[in-house]
A protein has these predicted regions:
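Contiguous mid-protein beta-loop-alpha structural module that forms a pocket-lining wall or clamp
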Residues: 171-184
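Core catalytic region of metal-dependent phosphoesterases/phosphodiesterases
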Residues: 9, 13-112
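Conserved catalytic scaffold of divalent metal-dependent phosphoesterases
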Residues: 81-169
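Hydrophobic alpha-helical segments and their boundary regions
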Residues: 67, 169-170
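Active-site metal-binding loops of divalent metal-dependent hydrolases
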Residues: 7-11, 44-45, 79-81, 125-127, ...
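Conserved acidic residues
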Residues: 37-39, 140-142, 175
Length: 184
């Protein structure tokens, strides 16, 4: 299975929308060219969570619809998509996902496991830490989806994160980890 991993899109309310559209078209073309089977977005589709503009909703809807038209698309929330300090506030993605009602668009808001063929996507949600779980079946390909900082992670540039919300050990039992939030 060929999986595309995207994170930290940070669509702004008013700025860079022409540039976003150009880059998004390049992403769509590449995903089609690569013939991906699955797309995963690991958080921070939005740049701000409390004051969203119609322009944000237009561009984010365009992005998510086109991703879902290409392949089944799974999205988790990042710290910019929802309000960690007020769980009763709506996040920045649910209204779009609900309005699109696209069969290939799956918003995974809570911690838990979603099985796609022989792959299990295990969401470790920053909004639902009390319900984190380990993979339920080691015969599957288990992929952790997490948006947050992780102590001890070394990036492709050699930078090592010496602080983090959680240690790297939270991913034990997973075959792969798809992250968001670390912009290096």
């Amino acid at each position: 299975m060929k999986i595309a991993h995207i994170a930290d899109t940070h669509i702004r309310n008013y700025k860079y929308h022409k540039e976003y559209r150009v880059i998004f078209e390049q992403i769509f073309d590449r995903l089609r060219e690569e013939q991906v089977d699955l797309i995963v977005h690991c958080g921070d589709l939005a740049h701000t969570k409390t004051q969203l503009s119609p322009e944000y909703f237009d561009l984010a809807t365009h992005f998510l619809k086109n991703l879902a038209d290409i392949a089944p698309t799974y999205i988790i929330l990042g710290n910019h998509d929802g309000n960690l300090k007020n769980e009763h506030r709506q996040d920045a993605i649910t209204p779009i996902a609900n309005a699109l009602a696209h069969n290939n668009l799956h918003l995974l808001k809570n911690a838990g496991e979603s099985v796609v063929g022989d792959v299990a996507l295990n969401v470790l949600s920053v909004f639902d830490e009390d319900n984190w779980m380990k993979p339920s079946d080691s015969s599957r390909i288990n992929i952790a989806l997490y948006h947050g900082s992780v102590s001890g992670v070394k990036t492709d540039t050699g930078w090592v994160m010496d602080h983090g919300d959680h240690p790297i050990s939270i991913f034990r039992g997973h075959d792969y980890v798809f992250l968001g939030d670390i912009h290096k």
